[in-house]
């Protein structure tokens, strides 16, 4: 058991500290402290020794050097059960420090400010704090280290009852090393970001556990949700069951797709694939257009809405079973409608804007693949008309909408659209011509005609068979990257069928 007789306290986050320090004083614990922490303690009538009085060495360099002293680190690292350590500490008059209460300069909070300057960031890099934390954590069998104000109450209870066991101290040791690792990762990441280096030679990733999930993709898989250091989720849950692993993936997909498309866009997601996308003058009309694409697959889906959900739209949504809705805003009337279906998960995120600097991370065996997210867009000026038949301005708008949809569909991806709504989606087929046929069949199965439709392909057509198939279905125009060794054959097929075809020069594979 660790007997707490002496504590060193030096914190930036002072929440809960006064009550905790008073408790330590009342239990006969001698407190050593520094700077602003010392002032707070004394202002509240708590006995404490200044660090420079303790070490006999003044704080120097504007407070940059306060605790980097053998009397501090000897007291933290000394193993009292080791006779040689004990003898040397007595010889040098180094008392044992049993408890360290330290949290670090607010580097992350500082660099999160848009106007932060380099010098301010540098001055918020803590040196002495991490050193004390690491020393105490290394010697956890004899020294307790606290880095989180939320832990003060538990330690008070333990000191008052069963005491501090080695096992308990070990749990705080793990938390302490995670704290310093996270701190260093934040510093490293920020400086790399300032340099413009997207893919550094050494990648430090720090994530904070936000919540434990009920299970993973399947009930036999454990799962949790973690947030990266520099990003705080602004998803606001309004009602519904706890989010599952699969729910979170689908909500994220619905947000990504909706955020990159025009106002009043609605997309319906099932297993990470869109089964309907549309935009209109209002979200209700867009929802109706998106749902008609594949109403069977929309059953049990997640709906993303770049706009406001009112009572009328909520009523339309609840006519069928859905897992959840993510939108910019829900009116009070909408919430009253949804309250009658309390299991429907509602997420509000007012800033429906994609973070365009996010990276795409994918673990593989013994490694991690990282790439830029596929956010690059094209304009009408990037289109190259390759057929004899030329597109009208309306055709260009329809083709651009189709192109904006196909990038979100699993490869091989084909989508048939009107000017503002999907008609049929062919997703995830190993053969492109099969995706062409699937998309047409999906539309026909729900009574939608693809005659006069716009067709987007996420990658080039390797053979003319895809063109022949979509022409037979009645498509009017095609947008695709081009770049096949058989482009001439594909263009010839389009000309034979009197189709419009444009090349984008950009592929949108989605593995």
UniProtKB/Swiss-Prot annotation:
The domain of life for this entry's organism is Bacteria
Question: Reaction catalysed by this chain?
Answer: (6R)-10-formyltetrahydrofolate + 5-amino-1-(5-phospho-beta-D-ribosyl)imidazole-4-carboxamide = 5-formamido-1-(5-phospho-D-ribosyl)imidazole-4-carboxamide + (6S)-5,6,7,8-tetrahydrofolate; IMP + H2O = 5-formamido-1-(5-phospho-D-ribosyl)imidazole-4-carboxamide
A Gene Ontology biological process in which this protein takes part is: 'de novo' IMP biosynthetic process
Residues in MGS-like domain copies: 1-147
Pathway(s) where this gene product acts: Purine metabolism; IMP biosynthesis via de novo pathway; 5-formamido-1-(5-phospho-D-ribosyl)imidazole-4-carboxamide from 5-amino-1-(5-phospho-D-ribosyl)imidazole-4-carboxamide (10-formyl THF route): step 1/1; Purine metabolism; IMP biosynthesis via de novo pathway; IMP from 5-formamido-1-(5-phospho-D-ribosyl)imidazole-4-carboxamide: step 1/1
Sorted keywords for this record are: Hydrolase, Multifunctional enzyme, Purine biosynthesis, Transferase
Read off the CDD domains from this record.
IMPCH
InterPro entries cross-referenced by the UniProt entry = AICAR_Tfase_dup_dom_sf (IPR024051), Cytidine_deaminase-like (IPR016193), MGS-like_dom (IPR011607), MGS-like_dom_sf (IPR036914), PurH-like (IPR002695)
Please list the GO terms describing molecular function.
IMP cyclohydrolase activity; phosphoribosylaminoimidazolecarboxamide formyltransferase activity
GO-annotated cellular components: cytosol
Q: Could you give the domain comment from the record? A: The IMP cyclohydrolase activity resides in the N-terminal region.
This one is known as Bifunctional purine biosynthesis protein PurH
| Gene name as annotated | purH
